[in-house]
Swiss-Prot record:
Residues 66-88 are annotated as: Leucine-zipper. Residues 1-18, 238-256 have a biased composition (Low complexity). Component of the DRTF1/E2F transcription factor complex. Binds cooperatively with DP-1 to E2F sites. Interaction with retinoblastoma protein RB1 or proteins RBL1 and RBL2 inhibits the E2F transactivation domain. Component of the DREAM complex (also named LINC complex) at least composed of E2F4, E2F5, LIN9, LIN37, LIN52, LIN54, MYBL1, MYBL2, RBL1, RBL2, RBBP4, TFDP1 and TFDP2. The complex exists in quiescent cells where it represses cell cycle-dependent genes. It dissociates in S phase when LIN9, LIN37, LIN52 and LIN54 form a subcomplex that binds to MYBL2. GO terms for cellular component: cytoplasm; fibrillar center; nuclear envelope; nucleoplasm; nucleus; transcription regulator complex. Keywords: Activator, Cilium biogenesis/degradation, DNA-binding, Nucleus, Transcription, Transcription regulation. The gene is E2f5. A motif (DEF box) lies at residues 71-108. Transcriptional activator that binds to E2F sites, these sites are present in the promoter of many genes whose products are involved in cell proliferation. May mediate growth factor-initiated signal transduction. It is likely involved in the early responses of resting cells to growth factor stimulation. Specifically required for multiciliate cell differentiation: together with MCIDAS and E2F5, binds and activate genes required for centriole biogenesis. Residues 109-205 are annotated as: Dimerization. Residues 1-40, 226-285 are annotated as: Disordered. This is Transcription factor E2F5. PANTHER family: TRANSCRIPTION FACTOR E2F, TRANSCRIPTION FACTOR E2F5. It comes from Mus musculus (Mouse). Belongs to the E2F/DP family. One of its GO terms (molecular function) is DNA-binding transcription factor activity.
Length: 335
């Protein structure tokens, strides 16, 4: 018997897979970006966020409707808008007013976010200008410090690095001066002056130091032609010894004339540093006991002669606003 031949109606075997195009051949399928007519950058979330924030800045009172924003930005998937709002809300830049509206924080009625940004730019420009001026001042300061250093280190100028009593009196003409040399940390207090019985104010100065002694000099000059009168405060004991010919009552005019006749004191003590140190204390006998007695007995003598402390210990403390004068029953003199 002859074998049966295959019929012509049999289906051919299907192909496995289409072979990829050769390397370098152009693709037959156009990209989705070109087919849609827009690039991938235009559909990115970053660009969409920039446009969304611009709408938020231009919105009245900073309130933006999300549906209107989606229509304006032509966003088909509203999920992308919600992704942006979730991030902004997470960093506390916006808050939800309702289900479909948000508001930029810190924007009140009648205020626009764009105006705030313009104001911020002006402030930044002002800060840059101030920083430029600060750098110029710092440069000027460095130049001055270097100039002072050059002057002080010069061997010729070193001999003149001191101030005389005459120089100080010329700066404060007609005033009674107290030159104070005190350690660092000294507390200075000037209470409010009180009116005396004669209508003049009573002035006080309280000094307190915990680290060292305080030295005070009284510097006075009656006229431009006279020499400065300088002696320590309080005066030494040898200057305040009672004289056999002391006067019991001296008028203020006599006290003034006596002050003009005081001998000249040494006033040119040098200093190798910038600190202004008072001149050396006057030697004993430079001011006669008669003149000191006349000054102390007058009504205008600015120094207080305190009585000796009692033999018993002092069992009380002074407050921070109290001074040594509070330990004695004395009347404050008028200056």
């Amino acid at each position: 018997m002859a074998a049966a031949e295959p019929t012509s109606s049999a289906q051919p075997t299907p192909q496995a897979q289409a072979q990829p195009p050769p390397h370098g051949a152009p693709s037959s399928q156009p990209s989705a970006a070109l087919a849609g007519g827009s690039s991938r950058h235009e559909k990115s979330l970053g660009l969409l966020t920039t446009k969304f924030v611009s709408l938020l800045q231009e919105a009245q009172d900073g309130v933006l409707d999300l549906k209107a924003a989606a229509d304006t930005l032509a966003v088909r998937q509203k999920r992308r808008i919600y992704d942006i709002t979730n991030v902004l809300e997470g960093i506390d830049l916006i808050e939800k007013k309702s289900k479909n509206s948000i508001q930029w924080k810190g924007v009140g009625a009648g205020c626009n976010t764009k105006e705030v940004i313009d104001r911020l730019r002006c402030l930044k420009a002002e800060i840059e200008d101030l920083e430029l001026k600060e750098r110029e001042l710092d440069q000027q300061k460095l130049w001055l410090q270097q100039s002072i250093k050059n002057v002080m280190e010069d061997s010729i100028n070193n001999r003149f690095s001191y101030v005389t009593h005459e120089d100080i009196c010329n700066c404060f003409h007609g005033d009674t001066l107290l030159a104070i040399q005190a350690p660092s940390g000294t507390q200075l207090e000037v209470p409010i002056p009180e009116m005396g019985q004669n209508g003049q104010k009573k002035y006080q100065i309280n000094l307190k130091s915990h680290s060292g002694p305080i030295h005070v000099l009284l510097i006075n000059k009656e006229s431009s032609s006279s020499k400065p009168v300088v002696f320590p405060v309080p005066p030494p004991d040898d200057l305040t010894q009672p004289s056999s010919q002391s006067s019991t009552s001296v008028t203020p005019q006599k006290s003034t004339m006596a002050a003009q006749n005081l001998p000249e004191q040494h006033v040119s003590e040098r200093s190798q540093t910038f600190q202004q140190t008072p001149a050396a204390e006057v030697s004993s006998g430079s001011i006669s006991g008669d003149i000191i007695d006349e000054l102390m007995s007058s009504d205008v003598f600015p120094l207080l002669r305190l009585s000796p402390t009692p033999a018993d210990d002092y069992n009380f403390n002074l407050d921070d606003n109290e001074g040594v004068c509070d330990l004695f029953d004395v009347q404050i003199l008028n200056y």
